[in-house]
Design a protein with these regions (language model features):
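Substrate-binding/active-site clefts of carbohydrate-active enzymes
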Residues: 1-16, 23-194, 222, 228, ...
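Loop/turn elements at helix/coil->beta-strand transitions in domains of secreted/extracellular proteins
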Residues: 11-18, 93-100, 195-200, 230-234, ...
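Conserved N-terminal glycine/acidic-rich loop preference
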Residues: 168, 186-193, 197-226, 242-263
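Conserved, mostly hydrophobic/aromatic
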Residues: 10, 20, 37, 92, ...
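Short, contiguous acidic/charged loop-to-helix segments that flank catalytic cores in large enzymes
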Residues: 209-210, 338-344, 385-392
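Glycan-recognition and catalytic regions of carbohydrate-active enzymes
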Residues: 290-296, 365-367, 371-420
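Short, flexible loop/turn elements at secondary-structure junctions
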Residues: 24, 41-44, 105, 175, ...
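Conserved alpha/beta catalytic core and glycan-binding cleft of carbohydrate-active enzymes
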Residues: 111, 219, 223-224, 232-379, ...
Length: 420
């Protein structure tokens, strides 16, 4: 509802596409630990049936979080939240805007109903037992357990987690056709009526599966499933490094453009690494390095992918670009949040925005960048939007730069020539 209330602002700014970080049910603020792929989180959507209690102080047993359980497992709340999302997409489409959802398909969360490590769904009549709960769970093959003997159940915590995180159980596609089919169904579901989303951004897409061969096989299937349901849906992947193996026309459409935009621009204009973890004076203003890096990485993408690549200055995984202009190396836990706002250079920020709005690709503004929001890397980069305290001059600059980008086709589909 909050997004719906601010659509006039987004439209006036010139926004044509809204990319959401994960919206599905999840216990975290970032929601990259999905609990239920079928429903929008009622804390974002609509809570129509409330009750229960929050965890008492000092209690860590989430099965006792009866208020959370009621909010996130009750069908009334889940269905009401999906209905509200349908209305949001309809309103965005009415305004000529598009919607991209974040698809986290490499792993889920320990709260997920398929695993249920937190025992949120245990004993609930509308849900099957999770793989953590029972060796006979219909979802057991969805995960890879290191100890498979029956004596390890109930409550088998010996499973594979993404990068070893037990809160992020890695999905075991190779051993479960049922899982593969379900995720392909999810890919179709949200781009189809009544939801009609316009595309997917795929989280850590190259990590999915246990082999490179299966990874490519899955994304080929995913593309067919999504494009059969909605031929115009965009498939955009998070990827670091050369994406060319996935951009041959049968897997991803394009990528978040770290290598051929965010990183070279950041080094050139600020001399900073994109997390603010390192400063390299020799790269600041180094035109040869900038052009060489851009040319090399752009050559890894064919023109159709390059023209829609997500060109960001900031996002939810890295420090805010405006903070990088202060040349402070470090993170919020060491420097404190106020340091992110100090000694920033808005002139350099404006230079970056001009490059963003005129370079080959799809300029993508991280919420709040246009209003002067600062922040070190995750989680400090996810501050709330400063309603009533925006940098109006910076907003006006963004608005004008966006207008110029939209009014000149050459900035969207023209070729690039470097004048040396």
């Amino acid at each position: 509802q909050g997004v719906m209330d601010k659509l006039d602002y987004l439209q006036d700014l010139g926004v044509e596409v809204v990319y959401f970080n994960p919206l599905f049910v999840s216990p975290s603020n970032h929601k990259y630990d999905i609990q239920d792929y079928d429903y929008i989180d009622p804390h974002y959507g609509k809570i129509v049936d409330d009750g229960g209690e929050v965890l008492p102080n000092g209690v860590t047993d989430n099965s006792q979080a009866t208020k959370y359980k009621k909010r996130t497992t009750g069908l009334k709340n889940l269905e009401a939240s999906n209905e509200l999302f349908i209305k949001l997409v309809e309103e965005l489409h009415r305004r000529g805007m598009k919607v991209i959802l974040d698809g986290v398909f490499n792993h889920c969360g320990s709260f997920n109903k398929w695993m249920d490590r937190e025992r949120i769904y245990e004993g609930e009549e509308d849900y099957e037992p999770g793989a953590y709960i029972s060796a006979d769970s219909p979802y057991r093959s969805y995960f890879r357990f290191f100890k498979e003997g029956p004596e390890n159940w109930p409550y088998n915590a010996n499973y594979d987690g993404w990068w070893g995180h037990d809160t992020l159980p890695k999905l075991n596609y190779e051993d479960s056709v049922k899982l593969e089919n379900y995720i392909l169904y999810i890919g179709r579901k949200w781009v189809s009526p009544p939801y009609n989303v316009d595309g997917w951004r795929l989280d850590v897409a190259a990590d999915l599966g246990r082999s490179n061969e299966y990874n490519h096989e899955f994304w080929q299937k995913f593309r067919r499933a999504v494009k059969d349901a909605n031929p115009n849906a965009l498939i955009l992947a998070e990827h670091y490094g050369d994406p060319s193996d996935w951009l041959k026309g049968d897997e991803w459409d394009t990528v978040m453009n770290y290598d051929a935009f965010m990183e070279p621009v950041t080094w050139f204009l600020t001399g900073m690494e994109k997390h603010s973890d390192e400063a390299r004076e020799e790269l600041l203003g180094n035109i040869d390095n900038f052009i060489g890096s851009m040319a090399h990485h752009m050559s890894n993408m064919l023109t159709p992918s390059l023209q829609v690549a997500m060109n960001e200055l900031s996002n939810h995984d890295h420090s805010r670009f405006l903070t990088r202009t202060n040349h402070m190396v470090g993170r919020v836990e060491h420097l404190g949040p106020e340091a992110a706002n100090e000694y920033v250079n808005k002139a350099v920020m404006r230079e970056a925005v001009v490059m963003q709005m005129t370079w080959v690709g799809a300029p993508t503004v991280y919420y709040g960048d246009e209003a002067g929001v600062c922040g070190f890397t995750d989680p400090d980069n996810r501050r709330t939007y400063p309603w009533g305290h925006e940098d109006q001059e910076l907003i006006a600059f963004h608005k004008e730069a966006i207008r110029i980008h939209k009014e000149h086709p050459a900035l969207k589909t023209g070729s690039l020539k470097i004048l040396s």
